[in-house]
């Protein structure tokens, strides 16, 4: 994935891309939470692939504010909507406890990976991430 494609995809995942009629906007990471239709693991792996593609750009002296905002938004809003007991999904009993735990794991992984990339340690950033393996 090119950095340009990763940037565009992250904007869809965060719901900040201006093309709101594109299916990627509705089916992205935050789109799957509002309205809640269940967790889609491929969205998590897609965000992680975007981070890998953008790792060099995120270590520069100047970084793209839209990319950082998208990553921050994904983590912040997923916590507010789906992980927090007062969030719309938990307070309305729309998300199971198992899905809350899984969403929390994903958000922590995205947040941690972003931190290590911004801190300049790409190897450490992806150390605990295991991408999906093809089925035999």
Residue ranges and their predicted role:
Residues 50-51, 110:
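Short low-polarity hydrophobic stretches
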Residues 1-50, 56-89, 93:
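N-terminal low-complexity, intrinsically disordered segments
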Residues 72-136:
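Amphipathic alpha-helical binding modules
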